[in-house]
Amino acid sequence: MAEKIFDESKFNGQIAVILGSGLGKITSNIKNSISIQYISIPHYPQTTVEGHPGELVLGTLHDIDILIAKGRFHYYEGYSFEEITIPIQLFSRLGIKYLIITNSAGSMNLNHPPGNFMVADSHMDCTFRSDSNDPEIRSHSIFHDPSLIQLAKSSAKKLEQEINTGTYCWTLGPCYETPAEIKNMRYLGGDAVGMSTVPEIVTAAKLGIKTLTLSCLTNYAAGISRSPLTHHEVVMNAKKFDKNFSNVIIEIIKKID
């Protein structure tokens, strides 16, 4: 897989970004871009969910070599932990040192309304699934890079964008959580909830990649708002907030050493 990327792009960067549902505007800022479809990469998983196109975009952003994954994989698509994290393994082989993981998430915190952004300083695995080949116990302190968190906060402040820190909760999906489940996660300290991201965080930490997780809060979680939840609504709201979200990511990338 890595050989194909090197052959087609001559990529020599250290920063990668994974885009969540409906989040893709940042790629319009990439110069000298090359697009590689997932389907053309040997042994690479394929996306099946709306809002996840399924391509790698490589190029430069403010003269910085960058790799962007448009589309990710989820447990509910039938993939294993190992398959979900194939992109992270690939990034490591490509020499990636910094990873920005994004997602569209439901807010469980009334102080973090839809349209705001959240940087994860901790996470909660509500699936109780793990890499079957790696039962190693790890400290949570290695998962979320403090310097990147500070960089995200200062970048958002510069752009006058509201950003909060909080705990991201991972659920299996594809069904949205019940109000009772949301109530329980809020009681345990959760601030945002989604169906992805944590396997990527764990694998990146194992591989020594410094990781930042950013959530675009697209809706309130079940039981907080009276509106019924749909994936289409999540994607539409993500697209509505995508410009400001992308600007924050660009500012962060510009500041990474």
Task: Enumerate the language-model features and the residues they cover.
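His/Asp/Glu-rich mid-to-C-terminal helical/loop segments that flank catalytic regions of hydrolases
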Residues: 222-257
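Metabolite-binding pocket within alpha/beta catalytic cores that recognizes anionic/polar moieties
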Residues: 1-140
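Generic non-transmembrane alpha-helical segments
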Residues: 5-8, 147, 151-162, 247-255
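Zn-dependent metallopeptidase/amidohydrolase metal-coordination segment
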Residues: 195-233
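Active-site/ligand-binding-proximal alpha/beta "capping" segment
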Residues: 154-191
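Short acidic/polar active-site loop segments enriched in Thr and Asp
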Residues: 97-98, 191, 210
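Non-catalytic positions within long, well-ordered alpha-helices that form the structural scaffold/packing
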Residues: 92-95, 186, 205
